[in-house]
Amino acid sequence: MNVLSIMDDLKRRMDGAISAFQHELGGLRTGRASASLLEPLTVEAYGSVVHINQVANISVPEPRMLSVSVWDKTMVGAVERAIRDSGLGLNPITDGMNLRIPLPELNEERRKELVKIAHQYAEQARVATRHVRRDGMDNLKKLEKEGEISQDEAHGLSEKVQKLTDETIANIDKILAVKESEIMHV
């Protein structure tokens, strides 16, 4: 394993932590309608469990309304049940093969709960980033021990790894701040 591949791997894994964090935040309900709100939901279809977006189109016709167009008439009931039982507090209105889902206003208590959950997701992303940093530092120490890089090179690369970690955590904090203001905005 060479230095370049270690640094590329660290960058890729830290970017992955940010992507996973953003994906988790996408599932949090804010005051605004978003198709990503329903994407994690699963429904039993044709003998297996699949995501809703594999049996229907999800769109946002209005800022506080989601629309789900189910492709197979036999799946409408299952999709409606999945949305109703999701714990998101949504009540779909069935209209043939389409479901309209009005998003109710979030109360202050629920908003604070969502912010708390967002902070938990952010902490998970920070921890994942720190684990990646630790792996990178261990690899650099191993290369130094094996004599592939000098002590000075190892020190310089360690600083680069720390800088990359700091940038990634700052990015996570920035994304969290945007999501927090989105949730708390009435």
Swiss-Prot record:
Keyword terms of this UniProt record: Cytoplasm, Protein biosynthesis
GO biological process, one term: cytoplasmic translational termination
Chief location category: cytoplasm
A cellular component annotation (GO) from this entry: cytosol
InterPro entries: Ribosome_recyc_fac, Ribosome_recyc_fac_dom, RRF_sf
Coiled coil: none
Subcellular location: Cytoplasm
Job description of the protein: Responsible for the release of ribosomes from messenger RNA at the termination of protein biosynthesis. May increase the efficiency of translation by recycling ribosomes from one round of translation to another.
Record family assignment: Belongs to the RRF family.
Protein name stated in the entry: Ribosome-recycling factor
